[in-house]
Amino acid sequence: MFLKAVVLTVALVAITGTQAEVTSDQVANVMWDYFTQLSNNAKEAVEQLQKTDVTQQLNTLFQDKLGNINTYADDLQNKLVPFAVQLSGHLTKETERVREEIQKELEDLRANMMPHANKVSQMFGDNVQKLQEHLRPYATDLQAQINAQTQDMKRQLTPYIQRMQTTIQDNVENLQSSMVPFANELKEKFNQNMEGLKGQLTPRANELKATIDQNLEDLRSRLAPLAEGVQEKLNHQMEGLAFQMKKNAEELQTKVSTNIDQLQKNLAPLVEDVQSKLKGNTEGLQKSLEDLNKQLDQQVEVFRRAVEPLGDKFNMALVQQMEKFRQQLGSDSGDVESHLSFLEKNLREKVSSFMSTLQKKGSPDQPLALPLPEQVQEQVQEQVQPKPLES
């Protein structure tokens, strides 16, 4: 199955560590993305994927990602392959069972909530309003910081570019030695500003998650008296909602970080090019400075437009998730895919636990001791054993 190739490639890149650092969340992302892709594909497409020559694809992907596969990667593959295959198979088998149990939970909750529909709707309305009040300042602050940080970066870098251009025009003697300090300071200021962007703009995911937890706990405590006899089911559904909402906080942090990395990736070569042109003719250096000056404005604007709306989009996504949950408690029209968040939550917990176990047992400098086949099977069985939903 093609899923196996992709999952194992990313996981191997993760734990070898010397070529790239990938977290258990990223490994779980790959597994979940391909699980949903297979679930959504037509039957013929799934069958075609299952017939794919995994061995050849796996070897190709390993070469692309890791170069020469080392002994540690080989050892890791032998442990991770059975787990990934078993877990993906378990996930597929569990889908229908979890779907039925989640639908039953919602039906029981609806039976309790429907007589109090107006009160429940008011509780959700009040809760959403409080959530927006807590999150709106973050979106406003994010936009303000973007403008301040990017303007400050341009204000610090532009004078160095202009000084170097002026030095070229004045035909200063010993041009190269005169320009080196400016070029070095330009690079240093650029690096400092990029680190400043990362420190100031990367969302405080843990703080956002704490806000979500507090908001949902307030809602749960208000709904609890209306869920007499089914409070455990209410708690379970609230856990699923919390997982979805906190996942948005993590995605927000990833999007901001990705955009900062992209800005650095676009501008860093231009800064390096200025330094490399110091040993050449003045025409090449002048063009390099012009390119940097032009791209600095353009790339900062692209970055600003990409990141500024993220705070508001995050807030809107949380409100939509709250509204969807309210609808699920009021009718049976919104719970078609509500089981998926529970499947994903379960998958991420199991991948995190398994990866943590592997990392404790080995390192790139000390290869993992390969288990016997029956030990692998036992470990996989323990990891993928489903947790029964509380009734």
Swiss-Prot record:
<keyword id="KW-0964">Secreted</keyword>
<feature type="repeat" description="11">
    <location>
        <begin position="269"/>
        <end position="286"/>
    </location>
</feature>
<dbReference type="GO" id="GO:0009986">
    <property type="term" value="C:cell surface"/>
</dbReference>
<dbReference type="GO" id="GO:0055090">
    <property type="term" value="P:acylglycerol homeostasis"/>
</dbReference>
<feature type="repeat" description="4">
    <location>
        <begin position="115"/>
        <end position="136"/>
    </location>
</feature>
<feature type="repeat" description="2">
    <location>
        <begin position="60"/>
        <end position="81"/>
    </location>
</feature>
<dbReference type="GO" id="GO:0032374">
    <property type="term" value="P:regulation of cholesterol transport"/>
</dbReference>
<dbReference type="GO" id="GO:0060228">
    <property type="term" value="F:phosphatidylcholine-sterol O-acyltransferase activator activity"/>
</dbReference>
<keyword id="KW-0597">Phosphoprotein</keyword>
<dbReference type="GO" id="GO:0034445">
    <property type="term" value="P:negative regulation of plasma lipoprotein oxidation"/>
</dbReference>
<feature type="repeat" description="13">
    <location>
        <begin position="309"/>
        <end position="330"/>
    </location>
</feature>
<feature type="region of interest" description="13 X 22 AA approximate tandem repeats">
    <location>
        <begin position="33"/>
        <end position="330"/>
    </location>
</feature>
<feature type="repeat" description="10">
    <location>
        <begin position="247"/>
        <end position="268"/>
    </location>
</feature>
<dbReference type="GO" id="GO:0065005">
    <property type="term" value="P:protein-lipid complex assembly"/>
</dbReference>
<dbReference type="GO" id="GO:0008203">
    <property type="term" value="P:cholesterol metabolic process"/>
</dbReference>
<dbReference type="GO" id="GO:0002227">
    <property type="term" value="P:innate immune response in mucosa"/>
</dbReference>
<dbReference type="GO" id="GO:0005543">
    <property type="term" value="F:phospholipid binding"/>
</dbReference>
<dbReference type="GO" id="GO:0008289">
    <property type="term" value="F:lipid binding"/>
</dbReference>
<feature type="repeat" description="8">
    <location>
        <begin position="203"/>
        <end position="224"/>
    </location>
</feature>
<dbReference type="GO" id="GO:0055088">
    <property type="term" value="P:lipid homeostasis"/>
</dbReference>
<keyword id="KW-0445">Lipid transport</keyword>
<dbReference type="GO" id="GO:0034362">
    <property type="term" value="C:low-density lipoprotein particle"/>
</dbReference>
<dbReference type="GO" id="GO:0120020">
    <property type="term" value="F:cholesterol transfer activity"/>
</dbReference>
<comment type="subunit">
    <text>Homodimer.</text>
</comment>
<protein>
    <recommendedName>
        <fullName>Apolipoprotein A-IV</fullName>
    </recommendedName>
</protein>
<comment type="similarity">
    <text>Belongs to the apolipoprotein A1/A4/E family.</text>
</comment>
<dbReference type="GO" id="GO:0034361">
    <property type="term" value="C:very-low-density lipoprotein particle"/>
</dbReference>
<dbReference type="GO" id="GO:0006869">
    <property type="term" value="P:lipid transport"/>
</dbReference>
<dbReference type="GO" id="GO:0016042">
    <property type="term" value="P:lipid catabolic process"/>
</dbReference>
<dbReference type="GO" id="GO:0042157">
    <property type="term" value="P:lipoprotein metabolic process"/>
</dbReference>
<dbReference type="GO" id="GO:0042627">
    <property type="term" value="C:chylomicron"/>
</dbReference>
<dbReference type="GO" id="GO:1903561">
    <property type="term" value="C:extracellular vesicle"/>
</dbReference>
<feature type="repeat" description="6">
    <location>
        <begin position="159"/>
        <end position="180"/>
    </location>
</feature>
<dbReference type="GO" id="GO:0019430">
    <property type="term" value="P:removal of superoxide radicals"/>
</dbReference>
<dbReference type="GO" id="GO:0034375">
    <property type="term" value="P:high-density lipoprotein particle remodeling"/>
</dbReference>
<dbReference type="GO" id="GO:0045202">
    <property type="term" value="C:synapse"/>
</dbReference>
<feature type="repeat" description="12">
    <location>
        <begin position="287"/>
        <end position="308"/>
    </location>
</feature>
<keyword id="KW-0677">Repeat</keyword>
<dbReference type="GO" id="GO:0005507">
    <property type="term" value="F:copper ion binding"/>
</dbReference>
<dbReference type="GO" id="GO:0033344">
    <property type="term" value="P:cholesterol efflux"/>
</dbReference>
<dbReference type="GO" id="GO:0042803">
    <property type="term" value="F:protein homodimerization activity"/>
</dbReference>
<dbReference type="GO" id="GO:0042744">
    <property type="term" value="P:hydrogen peroxide catabolic process"/>
</dbReference>
